[in-house]
A protein has these predicted regions:
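S-adenosyl-L-methionine-dependent DNA methyltransferase catalytic core
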Residues: 1-30, 66, 134-146, 156, ...
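Core alpha/beta nucleotide-donor-binding catalytic domains of modification enzymes
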Residues: 2-110, 117-129
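Short, solvent-exposed coil/turn elements at secondary-structure transition points
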Residues: 57-62, 148-150, 273
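Short, histidine-centered active-site or binding-site loop motifs used for metal coordination
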Residues: 83, 115-117, 246, 280
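Conserved short-loop catalytic and cofactor-binding motifs
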Residues: 87, 116-119, 151, 255, ...
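Conserved Class I SAM-dependent methyltransferase catalytic core
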Residues: 94-157, 161-166
Length: 332
């Protein structure tokens, strides 16, 4: 059986499946997913055909199938600036301990965790220290790094910490976060302006007000105008990090309109084949909660390379053993 067909993974706090996509591309098999949000589940089912289990806190670890890799973009609101950085004082922050109990029971070969970069500094670094200690106590050798979606060809400044761990120390030593940065291009994710529905555009009055407010600023196209609640506007060639709240109202393509659902998915690196089955408002929330797919793809491919080389190495050792001792038996 090919290695990819034998590798199984679980997708915790799955959202709309952004972390899963690169592992599906590798041919790995998802044997369990968990997501409690009904609309996210609707999107997940439409795109992957699997029905996620509900609230992970109510699922016994022994009811989760055996797996080789655990994936989890565990809830980040408790650690984010927008979420007031409550950390483990927020029930969403304690979701890490759900991961811990599953790891303790199943001991998968590898783990990939994703969260906001503020996780590393929350409570003066103590929260992150606890997480690393727990993973170490479970036998995982961990590496981590803050990565930016901009460096993966996406016109979105989205910084996230990626944590990768292996039970095998030698596997961990082989892993690194080295990658070749890619240029981003805002135009590449924008839809044809002639096909944008009229309700995505601001009124002429509001658009003129923005033009007047930015009369002293250099304007270029395409661009994203970032307008804060005070009305201050920054004009950039990329978007700030997509969020789940109302901030999408202040991300304006060329200062004229909001991003479309397809553009929001493209900002996260989702393929155009990805189905949209919920409202525009829901897609805004779901993409704000999701991940930069190309970022995860880079990490997934590195994990795959290590597991594949290990499998090939084991096969080579077995073959050498047979050749060596087989000859001795024959000569005897």
């Amino acid at each position: 059986m090919p290695l990819t067909e034998s590798i199984k993974f679980i997708d915790l706090f799955a959202g709309i499946g952004g972390i899963r996509i690169p592992f599906d591309e590798l041919g790995y098999k998802c044997v369990f997913s968990s997501e409690w949000d009904k609309n996210a589940c609707k999107t997940y089912i439409a795109n992957f055909g699997d029905i996620p289990a509900g609230d992970i806190t109510k699922i016994k670890e022994q009811d989760i199938p055996p797996h080789d890799i655990l994936l989890a973009g565990f809830p980040c609101q408790a650690f984010s600036i927008m979420g007031k950085m409550q950390g483990f004082n927020d029930t969403r922050g304690t979701m890490f301990f759900e991961i811990e109990r599953i790891l303790a029971y199943h001991k998968p070969k590898a783990i990939l965790l994703e969260n906001v970069k503020q996780l590393t500094t929350h409570d003066h670094g103590n929260t992150f220290k606890v997480i690393l200690q727990k993973l170490s106590q479970l036998g995982y050798h961990v590496k981590y790094q803050v990565l930016n979606a901009l460096d993966f060809g996406l016109p979105q400044k989205r910084e996230r910490i990626i944590i990768v761990g292996f039970l095998d120390k030698f596997d961990s030593e082989k892993f690194n976060f080295d990658f070749e940065k890619k240029d981003y291009n805002l135009a590449s994710i924008l839809e044809d302006e002639t096909k944008i529905p009229a309700n995505f555009y601001a009124s002429e009055k509001i658009r003129q007000k923005r033009l007047d407010f930015t009369s002293d600023k250099i304007k270029f196209f395409p661009s994203v105008w970032h307008e804060n609640k005070s009305g201050n506007i920054s004009i950039l060639d990329y978007s700030c990090a997509l969020r789940t709240g109302a901030s999408y109202n202040y991300l304006l393509v060329n200062g004229e309109r909001r991003f479309t659902p397809r553009e929001l998915l493209r900002l996260q690196g989702f393929p155009d084949s990805y189905k949209i089955v919920v409202s525009t408002q829901e897609i805004r929330r779901q993409t704000g909660n999701s991940v930069a797919v190309p970022m995860i793809r880079m990490v997934a491919q590195k994990i795959d390379s290590i597991l594949r080389s290990k499998e090939n190495g084991a096969t080579s050792e077995t073959q050498r053993f047979k050749e060596t001792y087989g000859k001795r038996v024959i000569s005897a």
